[in-house]
Amino acid sequence: MRSLDDPILRTVKIGVQLIGNDGANSPPAHALARRHIIENVVGYSVYGDYAQPNPTARIIEAVATGAVDVAVVWGPIASYFARSQPVPLVVVPVTPSRDTPTLPFVFDIALGVRRGEEAFRAELDAILQRRRPDINRILDEYGVPRVEMSEPRSAVQ
Protein backbone atom coordinates (compact mmCIF):
# COMPACT_ATOMS: atom_id res chain seq x y z
CA MET A 1 0.00 0.00 0.00
CA ARG A 2 1.43 3.34 -1.04
CA SER A 3 -1.69 5.39 -1.55
CA LEU A 4 -4.69 6.32 0.53
CA ASP A 5 -6.70 5.49 -2.59
CA ASP A 6 -5.53 1.86 -2.61
CA PRO A 7 -8.67 -0.37 -2.71
CA ILE A 8 -7.09 -2.73 -0.17
CA LEU A 9 -7.79 -0.14 2.53
CA ARG A 10 -11.48 -1.03 2.31
CA THR A 11 -10.78 -4.61 3.41
CA VAL A 12 -7.96 -4.49 5.98
CA LYS A 13 -7.98 -3.33 9.59
CA ILE A 14 -6.29 0.10 9.74
CA GLY A 15 -4.68 1.69 12.78
CA VAL A 16 -4.84 5.49 12.82
CA GLN A 17 -3.69 7.98 15.40
CA LEU A 18 -6.58 10.00 16.81
CA ILE A 19 -6.22 13.23 18.73
CA GLY A 20 -9.51 13.59 20.56
CA ASN A 21 -13.24 14.03 20.35
CA ASP A 22 -13.14 17.70 19.35
CA GLY A 23 -12.92 17.12 15.59
CA ALA A 24 -9.25 18.07 15.45
CA ASN A 25 -8.06 14.70 14.27
CA SER A 26 -4.95 13.69 12.42
CA PRO A 27 -4.72 14.18 8.65
CA PRO A 28 -4.87 10.39 8.03
CA ALA A 29 -8.10 10.10 10.06
CA HIS A 30 -9.70 12.89 8.04
CA ALA A 31 -8.39 11.52 4.73
CA LEU A 32 -9.77 8.04 5.40
CA ALA A 33 -13.12 9.47 6.47
CA ARG A 34 -13.29 11.51 3.25
CA ARG A 35 -12.97 8.20 1.40
CA HIS A 36 -15.72 6.66 3.57
CA ILE A 37 -13.22 4.25 5.10
CA ILE A 38 -14.37 4.21 8.71
CA GLU A 39 -15.79 0.80 9.63
CA ASN A 40 -12.40 -0.91 9.62
CA VAL A 41 -10.42 1.84 11.39
CA VAL A 42 -9.01 1.36 14.88
CA GLY A 43 -8.05 4.53 16.75
CA TYR A 44 -4.88 4.94 18.80
CA SER A 45 -4.30 8.01 20.91
CA VAL A 46 -1.59 10.32 19.67
CA TYR A 47 -0.71 10.99 23.28
CA GLY A 48 -0.88 7.46 24.61
CA ASP A 49 -0.76 6.33 28.21
CA TYR A 50 2.37 7.91 29.62
CA ALA A 51 2.24 5.55 32.59
CA GLN A 52 3.56 3.00 30.06
CA PRO A 53 6.94 3.17 28.31
CA ASN A 54 6.88 4.56 24.77
CA PRO A 55 3.13 5.25 24.61
CA THR A 56 3.19 6.30 20.96
CA ALA A 57 4.61 2.89 20.01
CA ARG A 58 1.26 1.13 20.60
CA ILE A 59 0.05 1.65 17.05
CA ILE A 60 3.26 0.16 15.60
CA GLU A 61 3.14 -2.72 18.07
CA ALA A 62 -0.43 -3.38 16.87
CA VAL A 63 0.87 -3.92 13.33
CA ALA A 64 3.64 -6.21 14.59
CA THR A 65 1.22 -8.34 16.63
CA GLY A 66 -1.47 -8.45 13.94
CA ALA A 67 -4.04 -6.46 15.92
CA VAL A 68 -4.24 -4.25 12.81
CA ASP A 69 -3.05 -5.01 9.29
CA VAL A 70 -1.66 -1.58 8.48
CA ALA A 71 -1.19 1.73 10.28
CA VAL A 72 -1.11 5.25 8.92
CA VAL A 73 1.30 7.02 11.25
CA TRP A 74 3.55 10.07 11.28
CA GLY A 75 6.80 8.97 9.61
CA PRO A 76 9.28 9.62 12.45
CA ILE A 77 7.17 7.64 14.93
CA ALA A 78 6.54 4.81 12.47
CA SER A 79 10.17 4.44 11.44
CA TYR A 80 11.62 4.73 14.91
CA PHE A 81 9.35 2.14 16.55
CA ALA A 82 9.14 -0.19 13.53
CA ARG A 83 12.87 -0.84 13.84
CA SER A 84 12.49 -2.31 17.33
CA GLN A 85 9.65 -4.75 16.62
CA PRO A 86 10.21 -8.52 16.79
CA VAL A 87 8.99 -8.93 13.20
CA PRO A 88 10.22 -6.98 10.17
CA LEU A 89 7.96 -4.05 9.30
CA VAL A 90 8.14 -1.91 6.18
CA VAL A 91 7.52 1.83 6.40
CA VAL A 92 6.57 3.58 3.17
CA PRO A 93 5.37 7.12 2.51
CA VAL A 94 1.79 7.36 1.34
CA THR A 95 0.37 9.61 -1.32
CA PRO A 96 -0.93 12.13 -1.86
CA SER A 97 1.47 14.30 0.13
CA ARG A 98 -1.41 16.78 0.48
CA ASP A 99 -4.92 15.31 0.58
CA THR A 100 -6.70 18.65 0.31
CA PRO A 101 -5.30 22.18 0.35
CA THR A 102 -5.67 22.20 4.13
CA LEU A 103 -4.62 18.61 4.87
CA PRO A 104 -0.86 18.15 4.39
CA PHE A 105 0.98 14.88 4.98
CA VAL A 106 4.43 16.44 4.66
CA PHE A 107 5.55 19.05 7.15
CA ASP A 108 8.38 21.55 6.96
CA ILE A 109 10.45 22.32 10.01
CA ALA A 110 11.75 25.85 10.42
CA LEU A 111 13.98 27.80 12.72
CA GLY A 112 12.97 31.35 13.55
CA VAL A 113 14.81 34.35 14.91
CA ARG A 114 13.61 37.80 15.91
CA ARG A 115 13.14 40.45 13.24
CA GLY A 116 16.25 42.48 12.74
CA GLU A 117 18.58 39.62 13.75
CA GLU A 118 19.94 39.10 10.23
CA ALA A 119 23.51 38.41 11.41
CA PHE A 120 22.30 35.78 13.87
CA ARG A 121 20.06 34.21 11.22
CA ALA A 122 22.97 34.09 8.77
CA GLU A 123 25.16 32.46 11.42
CA LEU A 124 22.52 29.81 12.13
CA ASP A 125 21.99 29.21 8.39
CA ALA A 126 25.75 28.68 7.96
CA ILE A 127 25.91 26.29 10.92
CA LEU A 128 22.94 24.28 9.65
CA GLN A 129 24.45 24.08 6.18
CA ARG A 130 27.86 23.04 7.54
CA ARG A 131 26.34 20.45 9.90
CA ARG A 132 23.80 19.10 7.37
CA PRO A 133 25.70 15.78 6.95
CA ASP A 134 25.76 15.32 10.75
CA ILE A 135 22.07 16.18 11.03
CA ASN A 136 21.21 13.74 8.23
CA ARG A 137 23.30 11.01 9.88
CA ILE A 138 21.42 11.44 13.17
CA LEU A 139 18.06 11.43 11.38
CA ASP A 140 19.12 8.26 9.54
CA GLU A 141 20.17 6.60 12.81
CA TYR A 142 16.67 7.19 14.17
CA GLY A 143 15.00 6.14 10.92
CA VAL A 144 13.38 9.53 10.35
CA PRO A 145 12.02 9.68 6.79
CA ARG A 146 12.57 12.95 4.97
CA VAL A 147 11.40 14.61 1.81
CA GLU A 148 14.33 16.57 0.47
CA MET A 149 13.66 20.09 -0.68
CA SER A 150 15.17 21.06 -4.02
CA GLU A 151 16.88 23.96 -2.26
CA PRO A 152 16.36 25.79 1.01
CA ARG A 153 13.50 28.25 0.95
CA SER A 154 14.20 31.92 1.39
CA ALA A 155 13.54 33.51 4.72
CA VAL A 156 10.20 35.06 5.54
CA GLN A 157 10.61 38.70 6.38
State what each model feature region is.
Residues 1-157:
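Proline/Glycine/Serine-rich low-complexity intrinsically disordered segments
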